């Protein structure tokens, strides 16, 4: 008999163990969480959902939710960021509510995970910009009273970084109170060179620069809230404050052609803060209909002061100041009920987003071609959606439809720009059909139409000074993209196949080209493009005793003509993840990966033949104390170089990232719990764009 587990993408606030007297029915409740079968696979395909069970596996003692996700099929975690192969960054839900920041995954213990589900064809309920969804279910805890967790980490790469987090909760009767506070000091160092070659005034020209970036920053988070439940109704709210201070420095040089390099230093001081408040309500009507409401408010502000100074005479200091303010109001209301022997969900969602950017160039000469300016964007969005799911015999069917109205307004120096402002009506359908041959063999096919909205920083009209001959900027004329995605997903025993073909219209990519100015200037900025792409991944994953391997091979191939050239070299990649249970309760993870050189949009990335990460962990004092030692890029073989060839400008960027290092993490828990705020972001996609 085997206890198997379903696992996939992202995770929730801290879930903690408790000491003290158990409720009399705790054993019954705990047994209800465990499924015991003779041949249940560790990872299985249910319709278009890949399910991984964590409870009872080697993965449950890895440390945090991030550690577990890094070992799951089609999942990758790098520097705390979760991604899905061929899909990019997923939306993560923990116990039905969305994750709002990466700290939730760091604070969630792997021993509190029950299962992880990966949706590669999410329906209309998740929004038309969502390509993948990770749903994490935690093990239920029934403890009352006080819970406490403290996690401290120290990391040494080229520089030292450290963080400390304290999480506390208290529950009595129907009321739960929780609070979290953390402070982190990050520091990194990136070295590299950038060389641009082009034809200018009928002659070959070269513009180059060297970089030695130091990026220390201090980040704080304070969060507090409550949950209250009574019978079939529950409600809650929380508030989060997030200040941040960064003091960046870049020392290097600039040159053109055969001239001697000019030494320069770029200093940038960034101060930002954000406030977020959220409320929710859940109601179960007549035992059949679930009613859910979420409301979200966010306000943030930041100030960035940049000064570029040159050691040689004849070059004046170039300084600028940028002030940015943004706000978001959003609401979401939906109801779920049984319909035609299936599950039906319908609802509405709205949001209002306002962003104001005031950019001031303080150098008069540079201001002739990089002017000061005030830009504002306002977006109103209203959506209605419906989703129906049903399983009959060996078939599973899911169909959905989403309508969205978007009113986007762009103002430049107090005047509305009608060429950029627009109103859109979007109708996006999705459908998925799956068939199960047996417990370990199934297949599904799905189609989804979705939209791709550029992040708000890419929609600004301001330009930024990068060097004597280089500029970077946004593009307020960027249009929302449309994406058609046809996908086949299959599983046979321990093998998983995921193949998708995407046709993207008006997605965006970066290009570099000549900028009209009195002197030679190059500008890098985003533009709309049309691209077709094929993703193909084959995974083998099957636990074998104390060893849990996961081997993935894949290929990405795109068809793109942009910037006066073709970008269609395929990228082949592999991932070999291993978890081994050692004696004395220790766990060892060893992960290797690599990829060939190839094109992704207008960028051609370099080859990494082999890179290795590893970690070892152990729990002490009845799992109250966890100790973990991890190492990244052990042999320093990661290749972060990339090139771009657009509009007659050939750019080669060689850079050495700060990835090689060692981290020690200590986690102490006293009566930890999994329960936290039960609501979800009313407009998570707008929060991500901000």
Pin down the residues of each PLM region.
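Face-selective signature of the C-terminal outer-membrane beta-barrel domain
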Residues: 219-245, 267-413, 436, 440, ...
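Outer membrane beta-barrel strand-and-loop segments of large Gram-negative receptors
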Residues: 328-332, 383, 473-475, 479, ...
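Surface-exposed extracellular loop regions of Gram-negative outer-membrane beta-barrel proteins
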Residues: 137-152, 244, 249-253, 305-309, ...
């Amino acid at each position: 008999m085997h206890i198997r587990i379903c696992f996939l993408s992202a995770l929730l606030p801290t879930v903690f163990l408790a000491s003290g007297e158990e409720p009399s029915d705790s054993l019954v409740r705990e047994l209800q969480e465990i499924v015991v079968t003779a041949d249940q696979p560790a990872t299985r395909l249910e319709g278009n959902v890949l399910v991984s069970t964590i409870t009872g596996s080697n993965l449950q003692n890895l440390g945090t939710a991030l550690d577990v996700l890094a070992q799951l099929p089609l999942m990758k975690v790098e520097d705390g960021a979760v991604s899905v192969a061929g899909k990019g960054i997923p939306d993560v839900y923990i116990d039905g509510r969305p994750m709002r920041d990466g700290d939730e995954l760091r604070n969630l213990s792997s021993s509190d995970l029950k299962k992880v589900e990966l949706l590669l064809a999410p329906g209309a309920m998740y929004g038309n910009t969502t390509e993948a969804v990770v749903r994490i279910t935690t093990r239920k805890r029934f403890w009352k009273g006080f819970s406490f967790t403290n996690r401290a980490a120290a990391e040494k790469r080229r520089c030292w970084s450290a963080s400390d987090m304290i999480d506390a909760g208290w529950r009595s009767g129907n009321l739960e109170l929780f609070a979290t506070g953390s402070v982190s000091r990050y520091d990194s160092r990136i070295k590299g060179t950038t060389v641009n070659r082009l034809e200018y005034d009928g002659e070959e020209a070269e513009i180059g620069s060297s970089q030695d970036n130091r990026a220390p920053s201090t980040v704080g988070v304070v969060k507090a809230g409550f949950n209250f439940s009574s019978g079939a109704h529950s409600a809650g709210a929380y508030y989060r404050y997030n200040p941040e201070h960064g003091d960046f420095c870049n020392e290097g040089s600039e040159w053109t052609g055969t001239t001697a390099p000019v030494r320069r230093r770029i200093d940038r001081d960034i101060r930002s803060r954000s406030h977020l408040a959220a409320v929710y309500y859940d109601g179960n009507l007549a035992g059949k209909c679930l009613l859910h409401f979420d409301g979200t408010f966010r306000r943030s502000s930041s100030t960035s002061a940049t000064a570029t100074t040159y050691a040689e005479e004849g070059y004046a200091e170039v300084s600028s100041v940028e002030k940015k303010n943004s706000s978001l109001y959003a609401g979401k209301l939906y109801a779920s009920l049984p319909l035609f022997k299936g599950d039906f969900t319908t609802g509405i969602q709205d949001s209002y987003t306002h962003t104001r950017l005031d950019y001031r160039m303080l150098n008069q000469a540079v201001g002739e071609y990089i002017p000061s300016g005030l830009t504002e964007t306002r977006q109103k969005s209203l959506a209605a959606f419906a989703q129906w799911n049903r399983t009959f015999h060996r078939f599973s069917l899911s169909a959905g439809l989403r309508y969205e109205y978007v009113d986007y307004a762009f103002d430049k120096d107090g005047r509305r720009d009608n060429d950029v402002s627009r109103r859109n009506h979007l109708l996006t359908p999705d459908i998925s059909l799956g068939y199960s041959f047996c417990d370990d063999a199934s297949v599904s096919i799905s189609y989804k139409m979705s939209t791709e909205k550029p992040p708000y920083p890419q929609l600004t009209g301001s330009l930024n000074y990068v060097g004597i001959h280089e500029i970077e900027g946004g593009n307020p004329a960027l249009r929302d993209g449309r994406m058609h995605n046809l996908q086949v997903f299959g599983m046979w025993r321990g093998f998983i196949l995921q193949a998708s073909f995407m046709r993207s219209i008006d997605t965006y990519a970066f290009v570099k080209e000549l900028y009209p100015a009195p002197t030679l200037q190059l500008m890098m900025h985003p533009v709309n493009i049309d691209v077709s792409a094929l993703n193909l991944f084959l995974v083998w994953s099957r636990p074998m005793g104390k060893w849990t391997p996961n081997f993935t091979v894949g290929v990405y191939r795109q068809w793109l003509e942009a910037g006066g050239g073709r970008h269609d070299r395929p990228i082949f990649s592999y991932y070999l993840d291993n978890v081994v249970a050692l004696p004395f309760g220790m766990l060892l993870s060893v992960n290797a990966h690599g990829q060939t050189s190839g094109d992704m949009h207008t960028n051609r990335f370099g080859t990494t033949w082999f890179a290795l990460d590893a970690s070892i962990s152990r729990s002490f004092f009845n799992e109250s104390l966890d100790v973990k030692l991890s190492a990244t890029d052990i042999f320093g073989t990661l290749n972060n170089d990339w090139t771009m060839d657009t509009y007659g400008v050939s750019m080669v960027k060689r850079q050495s990232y700060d990835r090689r290092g060692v981290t020690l993490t200590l986690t102490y828990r006293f009566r930890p719990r999994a329960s936290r705020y039960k609501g979800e972001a009313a407009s998570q996609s707008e929060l991500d764009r901000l």
